[in-house]
Amino acid sequence: MGVSYYMGDLNPTLPFAMSQLEYGGVIRFNYNNRWTFRADYAYATVKADDKIIKWRPERELNFTSKIHDLSFVAEFNFLEYYTGNPKRNVSPYIFGGISVFYYTPFAEINGELVNLRYENPKTKTLRYTEPPLPDNAKWYDRLAYKSMPVGFSIPFGVGVKLALSKHMAATMEWRMEKTFTDYLDDVGTVYPEQHAKYIDVNGTEFDLTDPTGNYKPGQQRGNSAFNDWFGMARVSLTWKFNLPDGRGCNLSKF
């Protein structure tokens, strides 16, 4: 369990800004005293708001993305480490690997999260359909979304592990994920001619592409030269199960 954060078009410079809760689980295989291989699952939320981050407050954009992340990484212990050995019970480590994640971006309108992704197979435009809206709410067509709901990333980071008993260990780590998408925040390139608009149950119209109404098509909306990142800082507890050959496999929730 820990916190997750985002860095990208709305927040290019401030780690841990607007951090959110993240949680998940890990299965770890201790190959030897130096090398460990593991599979991680994490459910994380990342968000940013121009009015709070103030990198470009005049845009007045905001987003919240829900992320389901599955990664496979290798850890290298700087010191010989073995859970249950009082002489080898602590070590800093580094890790790296590959990750696949599913994400859904939302915009916040008057405290309500509006889903920014749905492609209509007939018109190749996006409409808001899930979760269901009231009958008198509408979603206007917008340009086809320029990303898939599934992304790939390279996770890497540093941490420290400490054996608490013969079978239990604790780890603390900081992790970054370099993604290959610029649409984790639904912001990229320039303002299009066709805007995403939402009308609430009271008939109030909101422009999700340009809330200010001050930008013309072709003006810069985001920075497409750099893809988005997200990171996590977490603490985990693991429990070691001995395999038949004596090697350990740590199963945990964090």
Residue ranges and their predicted role:
Residues 4-8, 40, 44-48, 99-105, ...:
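Structural signature of outer-membrane beta-barrel domains
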Residues 35, 40-127:
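Gram-negative (and chloroplast) outer-membrane scaffold detector with strong preference
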